[in-house]
Amino acid sequence: MAVGTTPGELRELTDDELKDKLRESKEELFNLRFQMATGQLSNNRRLRTVRQEIARVYTVLRERELGLASGPAGEES
């Protein structure tokens, strides 16, 4: 099974939790890129999965901004 967070799991998080997840993912991507540049990265696939996770978080945040989806448990953001 894929490592990471599914869109359904992300939609259950609050906006603040999503922003924290986004920050953590961006930090991880930075570290992975640094490891790649120094030749220490053993799992190149992780770069792609982290980028996809960042895109998923941005998508959920944008859906809420446009009113296409509500926050967790039907709360409006």
From Swiss-Prot:
Q: Is Transferase given among the entry's keywords?
A: no
**Keyword Hydrolase, does the record have it?**
no
GO terms for cellular component: cytosolic large ribosomal subunit
Q: Name one GO molecular function term.
A: structural constituent of ribosome
User: What family does the Swiss-Prot or TrEMBL record give for this protein?
Assistant: Belongs to the universal ribosomal protein uL29 family.
Record PANTHER family:
60S RIBOSOMAL PROTEIN L35/50S RIBOSOMAL PROTEIN L29 (PTHR10916), LARGE RIBOSOMAL SUBUNIT PROTEIN UL29C (PTHR10916:SF0)
In Swiss-Prot or TrEMBL terms, this protein is called: Large ribosomal subunit protein uL29
Q: Which species expresses this protein natively? A: Mycolicibacterium smegmatis (strain ATCC 700084 / mc(2)155) (Mycobacterium smegmatis)
